Each structure stands twice: as C-alpha cells, then as structure tokens.
Amino acid sequence: MSLQRALQYLWDAEPHNTDHVTPLFCLGQVYDADTSLKEVNDDTEEDGIVVPLDTSNDTSWPPDFLADVQSRIWLSYRTGFPLIPKSDGSGTIHLGKLKNMIRGGGFDPRGYTSDVGWGCMIRTSQSLLANALLFRHLGRGWRWNKGDDFVYLSEGNTESRGGESRNGGANKEQETAVSEETAVSEETIISWFLDSPDSPFSIHKFVRHGEKACSTPAGDWFGPSAAGSSIYALCNEFPDSGLKVYYNGNGGGDVYEDELLETGFPLLVLCGLRLGIDNVNPIYWDSLRQMLSLPQSVGIAGGRPFTSHYFFGFQGEQLFYLDPHQPKPAVKTTDKDTTSFHSSRIWKLHLKEMDPSMLVGFYITSEADWETFKGSLTASKEKTSSQIVHIHPSRHNIPSFDEEDEYVSIGGASDDDFVDVTKRARKVAAMTGNTGSGRSSPSILDSHLVTETRDIIESVPPRKRVDNDLTSAPVDVPKPVQKRSQSHGDWEKVEEPEEEMVEVESMKGMQDNGCSAEYGSLVDRDAEADDSTLSTETTDRDWVV
C-alpha cells in the first residue's frame, strides 16, 4: 500500500453507529439499530432499584448486523498476481498507467501484475457475483467466522438474533435450494475468483472478455455494461457454478419475462442503470433503497464518480458499502485462508453523493421466488416516486405510451442512445435541469449535448410514444423545436428544416456481444483512477465510470 493510500485509509475514519432508531438493512435483512446496546438485559439492578441501561454514548454496531456484513465476500485490489498481458496493438503504456503499475508493486513492460488504479469496477462486480454464489450454495443464513469453522443461522435463529427478512417465503426458497448441497464450500467459491488465468471468475477472465466483446483494453476501466456482460459470459462458460444469468445487454431496467423464464433457475438477474446526469436523481432514492431491502437483492456495483463500491445495505439515506480500493497481496491457489476476503469495516455514503451509473443484481431461486419478487415490485410501486426496474411480458409486447405509463423512450437500444422520462422526472427536470432517467442518459456530459437532450425530451408530446428500434435508426423529432436562447433566459421558437432527423449512432457491433457503450463520466485514461478532473475535450478520452 502506498503512503498516500495508507494515510487516506487512516484519515477516512470508520463510521460509527450514531442512529439507534432507524433500522439497518443488509441484502434484504433488517436489523434493529439498538440491539447491540442490550447485550443481556435492558435494565440493570442496583440496591433493588431497576435502572435503565444508558446507551446514549454507545457507537458500536449491532452484533447480528456486523456478523452479516462480515460474511459478505469482499473482492479488492490485489498486487503480485500472474501477468495480464497488454492488449494486442498496444505498443506503449501511458504515464497514468505506469504510475498505477508502480503503485501496484512494480513495473512490467509486458502488462499488469496488479489492478491498482483501474480494476475497482471489476472487483465490485466480482463481489456482487460472489455473494450471489454464496446464497446459491450456502444460503442466506450462512455466517463466516475466522478459522475453519462457520455458523449457519436458520430462519428462526436469524429472527431471534435481531435480523428479520422482509419476506420470509423468499428465505425459505433459498434454504430449500441449498438444503441438499454441501459440496461447494466458501473456500471453493472464493477459489473461483482467485487472480489466476485458470480461475473461472478471475480478473484475468474479466479482462479477456472486456477486450474481446467490449473493446476495453487491459488496464482500462470497466463500466457497468462491460461488467454485466462479463458476468453473463463467464457464468455461461462455467456451468459448474450452478448459477444462470439473465442480463439485458441493451442496458436499462427493462426485464422481459419470457426470456427470463427460458433461462431457468437459480438465476442472477442483472440490470445496468443510469439514474441521473451527475448524481442519482432524488426521485429514485426510494426505489434504490427498496431494491436493497428485497430478500432477492445481492447488492449494487456502483459508487461515487470515478470510484466503484459494492453497496450491500442502508440506514435512512446512508448507503453501506465495501471499498475495493485497499490493495492486498494476491492469494495463491494453495492458500486456504479466506480472511482477506472479509471485512468488519463499514463505509457509508449518502445517496446524494452516489454516481448514477450502476449494476444492480437479484438472486432468484425458482419460478415461485420470481413471482414473489414481482409481487414485491408491484406492492412498492405506489410507495416509491419512480420505479427503476420494469417487467414486461416480452420484448415485443410493451404497451403503448399514455398518461399512466412510467416512461417514454427515445432513440436506439444501446446504453447511450436513449433516455426514459417519468412523469414526475419531467416535472423535476423542468425545475432543476436534471434529466436523470430510470434507464439511461447520454454519457457525453458537455453542456451542449445536455442542452440538446433536454430539447428533445421537452419536444415529445406527453401522450406520444416513440418505440425503441433494436437496430439503429433515425428518430423523427416534432417540429418546431423549443430551444433556450444562449443570450437570455427567454424561450424562442426556432424553425428547423422539416426533413431534419436526429441520427442515432449505430452500436450494433457492441450489441451483438452483449456489451453496449459505456455510460459514466469523462475521465482521462492516462490519469490515476482516483483523479476527479473533468475535461471538455474528447480527444483520447473515454466515457467510463
């Protein structure tokens, strides 16, 4: 670990439990924030007088919640692993990548022996997948202890110790799915993620798929789309994982039920989302928290701008996450110690600081569990200001848009080619200028394109739906278009040629590989991963998270 990183780690003090009222959530389990403060009895007795226990200064986390957090598999930066060769045609290593190599423990002109500075999105995506596999093979009640032993909590034991499922039926489904399976241990699951070219879910395999299917060279940052595409492909290549994957490669929160049911169970459902321009639009905060409170949740790979985290829970408006930016030596395939894959450290991030690009995962055990999941989304529809996951009977059976529909789609099917606008979002956008969406927003964040995007959105009549075309196609824009004058705040009508069309750039080549254009923030690939300097120039830059 570099001196800078060590100082940052020490400076970033671990958050304490200062809210003893608001419940704590961890992947569908809810915990009383005050349970740790009542270890034996709520009261103490002094000279025959019952005195309430003073808990006002206690800042510890409830032990049941902490045990659940420690049991999550945590993938992070590693150093000293077998070489990941430079991508074909890459003759040089830029200064930014060279600095990351040195930070990661050394320089090798042939490629990378550490992912420090560029692998955080891969690590958080690995964490999401690893915990889905943990649920698949060991169940939701499994708990990790240091050493070779572990604790398994049945549903009843979980409730008695303070953790409750938001849906007991889903927990029973998960326990049934693993009741007869003991061959796959936690050690086995972690071995699938070790940093070796032979491990099925290693960083080497993620990078290989990113190069082949997503045009992401070794040493470059992944976005949610490349991460989701990699998980989908690698699980298909390794059926021994016992987990199938449904991933809508076009991005967004659209889930097509007929395709999902054909995939089979147990199933990991992945949704790549973008919920705003610079930050998550507040109208989606309730939906995000609801996603993490579902018993099917396996977390979110996302983060703050330029930095990816693995989000597993929340308390109020604070999200809990595991941070992959803690470099550790690579674990050898012969090492059975799994301690470095677990953490008792809890990080918090307010929803307003969260980057809008993310990969959301759900573990579905069976068709019955799928029906339960759908019911949970339906029940919460009236409680949340805007849904972020939309379930359709099929890709070709999406109802036409009217006043009651959730969204209107404009443009093509790739991540960067369309925006969805909810009725509430349209109102908020008119007041705040934030055109965040439930599916995707343009990745190019310069002011010119943001203005053009807003113009297109505002030009669509409320009762008109422009359907997505699965291939790239021009989209007619109603004329005249209302545009804001550059010189003053008044609205002026600009007559455009009647034949003018908005051209949607073809992304077919990337769609065929299940990997759409990445969405995120403009960063310099030659800079360090933690740098947060935006640039208005697009030369030799990429839009990534």
From Swiss-Prot:
Disulphide bonds in the chain: none
Keyword Protein transport among record annotations: yes
Top-rank taxon, per record: Eukaryota
Keyword Flavoprotein: no
Enzyme class: hydrolase
Main location: cytoplasm
A single BP term in Gene Ontology: aggrephagy
UniProt GO cellular component terms: cytoplasm; nucleus; phagophore assembly site
Pfam families reported for this sequence: Peptidase_C54
InterPro entries tied to this protein: Papain-like_cys_pep_sf, Peptidase_C54, Peptidase_C54_cat
Reactions it catalyzes: [protein]-C-terminal L-amino acid-glycyl-phosphatidylethanolamide + H2O = [protein]-C-terminal L-amino acid-glycine + a 1,2-diacyl-sn-glycero-3-phosphoethanolamine
Location of this chain's protein in the cell: Cytoplasm; Nucleus; Preautophagosomal structure
GO molecular function, one term: protein-phosphatidylethanolamide deconjugating activity
Positions annotated as active site in the UniProt record: 120, 323, 325
PANTHER family xref list: CYSTEINE PROTEASE, CYSTEINE PROTEASE ATG4
Functional note: Cysteine protease that plays a key role in cytoplasm to vacuole transport (Cvt) and autophagy by mediating both proteolytic activation and delipidation of ATG8. Required for selective autophagic degradation of the nucleus (nucleophagy) as well as for mitophagy which contributes to regulate mitochondrial quantity and quality by eliminating the mitochondria to a basal level to fulfill cellular energy requirements and preventing excess ROS production. The protease activity is required for proteolytic activation of ATG8: cleaves the C-terminal amino acid of ATG8 to reveal a C-terminal glycine.
Family: Belongs to the peptidase C54 family.
Name by which UniProt lists this protein: Probable cysteine protease ATG4
Gene transcribed to yield this protein: ATG4
